[in-house]
């Protein structure tokens, strides 16, 4: 067998394994229900089928080909609403055997064209399952402190469900049955408008007015008793659930901002810590760089030590004068002949300062002391000599 034929064998299986959207519908015994189904864009056969428990196949209940199953003749109608993209199937005079699994679909093949799964549950009006169900209690660890608790909501016991049977719909005044122990009161059916204003005193209308109102209600097609009953129960459960979820939601509304605030504080602390560490690292690098620059400058200086200078010598800071000038001054003196007498001893002047002399100012002015030779110091009378003792 060719391999390309194998996917054809899995087509029915894939259609059976497709997950369909499921809708649950509940109805009262003897009442009616309306099932909403999606309407395809193409003009094809649409139907409502019921799944058989034994074989698993889906048998057609009603379709657009004017087919109605024998069990539902006179009790089921199918209407199309193209503008809303849906079609409605209304089933009246419900019985307990009508409970089961239904499916909406489109196409000629009933088993493969399913678009929606519908579960119908038919029950009596006084079934115990319709009593108020207690809400599950929240765990003790989830209870909020006293400061964060919300005020208690109204108790759900204030809502009283009134159920009537089809046999009691024609009776207007209430009938009281007395007994030695208990008292049971059967109340007539109350419409939605009268249930809202239930605290007001009741007024009974004349028979002519009642007949006119009944005729008007017949023209306007009032809602079925099952629908009204479902509406009241659904509203009651929604209020109970809303009060419970409101208390739980209040705790989450307080807990979430607290966690976010702590998370933001932790992030801010990390950012500040990183900034401080970076600043410290930059300061350490700057210090190390300064130390390296100082060491580099000291290593580049010449290592030859300067000539030590005496602190007491005032001329140590002045540069030395070249000796060429002194040589030039001494070279002008005439040299005495061999027969000439020796010149007298030159005048010796002590260069040491006097004791009473004030301290000399340090300056770079040069003081030149020239010793004039004896030949230059002679007068016209060469025989006169002046001897200065040393």
Swiss-Prot record:
Phosphoprotein as UniProt keyword: yes
Residues bearing the modification Phosphothreonine: 92
Inducing stimuli: Regulated by circulating IgM levels and immune cell activation signaling. Down-regulated in activated T cells, effector memory and central memory T cells, as well as in activated NK cells. Transcriptionally down-regulated upon TLR9 signaling. Down-regulated in response to IL7 and IL15. Down-regulated in old age.
Gene Ontology CC: one annotated term: extracellular region
Tissue and organ distribution: Expressed by CD19-positive B cells and CD4-positive and CD8-positive T cell populations in primary and secondary lymphoid tissues (at protein level). Among B cell subsets, detected in a subset of bone marrow pro- and pre-B cells, in most follicular and memory B cells and in a small subset of germinal center B cells (at protein level). Expressed at lower levels in CD56-positive NK cells (at protein level). Expressed in lymph nodes, lung, thymus and kidneys. Very weak expression detected in spleen, liver, heart, and salivary gland.
Membrane topology: Single-pass membrane protein
Signal sequence range: 1-16
SMART domains per record: IG (SM00409)
Chain spans, region CDR1: 40-45
Domain Ig-like: 23-123
Annotated function: High-affinity Fc receptor for immunoglobulin M (IgM), both secreted and membrane-bound IgM. Primarily regulates IgM transport and homeostasis. In lymphoid cells, enables exocytosis of membrane-bound IgM on the plasma membrane as well as endocytosis of IgM-antigen complexes toward lysosomes for degradation. In mucosal epithelium, mediates retrotranscytosis of antigen-IgM complexes across mucosal M cells toward antigen-presenting cells in mucosal lymphoid tissues.
Quaternary state and interactors: Interacts (via Ig-like domain) with IGHM (via CH4/Cmu4 domain), both secreted and membrane-bound IgM; the interaction is glycan-independent and multivalent theoretically involving up to eight binding sites for the IgM pentamer.
Domain writeup: The Ig-like V-set domain comprises three loops analogous to the complementarity-determining regions (CDR) of Ig variable domains, which are responsible for engaging IgM. Mediates multivalent interactions with the CH4 domains of pentameric IgM, facilitating receptor clustering and signaling.
Name under which the protein is recorded: Immunoglobulin mu Fc receptor
The organism of origin for this protein: Homo sapiens
């Amino acid at each position: 067998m060719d391999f390309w034929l194998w996917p054809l064998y899995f087509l029915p299986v894939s259609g059976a394994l497709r997950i369909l959207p499921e809708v649950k519908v509940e109805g009262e015994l003897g009442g009616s229900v309306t099932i909403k189904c999606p309407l395809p864009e193409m003009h094809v056969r649409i139907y409502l089928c019921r799944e058989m428990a034994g074989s698993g196949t889906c048998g057609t209940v009603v379709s657009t080909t004017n087919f109605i199953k024998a069990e539902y003749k006179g009790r089921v109608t199918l209407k199309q609403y193209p503008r809303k993209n849906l079609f409605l199937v209304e089933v009246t005079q419900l019985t307990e055997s009508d409970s089961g699994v239904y499916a909406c679909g489109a196409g000629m093949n009933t088993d493969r064209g399913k678009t929606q799964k519908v579960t119908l549950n038919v029950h009596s009006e006084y079934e115990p399952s319709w009593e108020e169900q207690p809400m599950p209690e929240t765990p003790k660890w989830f209870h909020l402190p006293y400061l964060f608790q919300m005020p208690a909501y109204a108790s759900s016991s204030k809502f009283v469900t009134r159920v009537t049977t089809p046999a009691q719909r024609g009776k207007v005044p209430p009938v009281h049955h007395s007994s030695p122990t208990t008292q049971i009161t059967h109340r007539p059916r109350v419409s939605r408008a009268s249930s809202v204003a239930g605290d007001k005193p009741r007024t009974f209308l004349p028979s002519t007015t009642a007949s006119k109102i009944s005729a008007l209600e017949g023209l306007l097609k009032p809602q079925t008793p099952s629908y009204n009953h479902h509406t009241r129960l659904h509203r009651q459960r929604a209020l109970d659930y809303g009060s419970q979820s409101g208390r739980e939601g209040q705790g989450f509304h307080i807990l979430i901002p607290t966690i976010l605030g702590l998370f933001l504080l932790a992030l801010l602390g990390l950012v500040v810590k990183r900034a401080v560490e970076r600043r410290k690292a930059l300061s350490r690098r700057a210090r190390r760089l300064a130390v390296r620059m100082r060491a580099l400058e000291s290593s580049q200086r010449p290592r030859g030590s300067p000539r030590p200078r005496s602190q007491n010598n005032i001329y140590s800071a002045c540069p030395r004068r070249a000796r060429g000038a002194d040589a030039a001054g001494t070279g002008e003196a005439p040299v005495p002949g061999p027969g000439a007498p020796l010149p007298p001893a030159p005048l010796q002047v002590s260069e040491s300062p006097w004791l009473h002399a004030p301290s000399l100012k340090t300056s770079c002015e040069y003081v030149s002391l020239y010793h004039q030779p004896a030949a230059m110091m002679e007068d016209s009378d060469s025989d006169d000599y002046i001897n200065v003792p040393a």
